[in-house]
């Protein structure tokens, strides 16, 4: 079972000295938007006694923040352990957004082929956001109302370039430590230029698996028709176990 402390996230990978550790980071899917016993990290640990998986996430903040959040746990990974970045199709819109849920957040920019992390806005408005219910609710409502969902072709391509460059840099760092990094893509069926994205990942020698077709069937979705239900979590758990098994055999 995953033993991460849900409140403080301080306990990770206990009792796994003889097992290969699998750290999974991502958005709300990785947070486990389902009954605890149906989370796919729990399912992985039930499917195989060779692995100890723990899934973490920070929904809505984009892949860059998912990686940054995971950094504090990377130190628990050893040689030949596995790091998985679970990337949803809507994560690419989160890359360059400056706010989420009425909160200012770090965001990535691409200027002159140089990727930069811009810090969050530290204005008094956002400082008092968490100290006033009315202000917090108002900012969250306005953020949801004004949230951008339609992006130009250039914006989509820019987000893909930022994603690939940021991930490439971090994955190369993990490889230098003999940690196995891989991306699991999903919910990309309606994402423009997804074929171009896959070609970019291939060109940068980034290992990835696209689960979009596999998980598109609604029988794998929960009542919100977005997150995975018990069957969906079990499906991806089996895919992860099979991938790691095959990767280690080769």
PLM features: what roles do these ranges have?
Residues 53-63:
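A conserved hydrophobic secondary-structure block that centers on an alpha-helix together
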Residues 28-31, 55-56, 156-157, 222-226:
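Second-shell loop/turn segments in exported
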Residues 224-250:
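Histidine-centered active-site loop/cap adjacent to the catalytic His
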């Amino acid at each position: 079972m995953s033993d991460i402390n849900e409140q403080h996230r301080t306990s990770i990978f206990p009792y796994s000295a003889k097992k290969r550790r699998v750290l999974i980071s991502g958005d709300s899917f990785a947070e486990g938007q389902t009954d605890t016993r149906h989370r796919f990290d729990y399912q992985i640990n039930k499917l195989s006694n060779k692995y100890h998986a723990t899934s973490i996430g920070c929904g809505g903040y984009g892949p860059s923040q998912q990686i940054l959040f995971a950094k504090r746990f990377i130190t628990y990974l050893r040689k030949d352990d596995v790091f998985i970045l679970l990337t949803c199709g809507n994560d690419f819109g989160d890359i360059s957004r400056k706010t989420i849920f009425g909160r200012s957040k770090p965001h990535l920019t691409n200027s002159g082929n140089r990727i930069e992390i811009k810090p969050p806005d530290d204005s008094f408005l956002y400082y008092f956001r968490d100290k006033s219910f009315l202000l917090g609710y108002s900012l969250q409502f306005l953020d949801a109302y004004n949230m951008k969902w339609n992006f130009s072709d250039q914006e989509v391509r820019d987000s893909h370039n930022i994603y690939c460059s940021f991930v490439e840099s971090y994955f190369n760092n993990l490889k230098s430590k003999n940690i196995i990094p891989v991306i699991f893509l999903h919910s990309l069926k309606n994402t423009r230029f997804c074929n171009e994205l896959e070609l970019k990942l291939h060109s940068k020698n980034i290992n990835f698996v696209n689960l979009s077709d596999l998980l598109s069937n609604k029988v794998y979705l929960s009542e919100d028709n977005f997150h995975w239900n018990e069957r969906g979590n079990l499906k991806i758990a089996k895919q992860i176990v099979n991938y790691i098994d095959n990767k280690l055999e080769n």
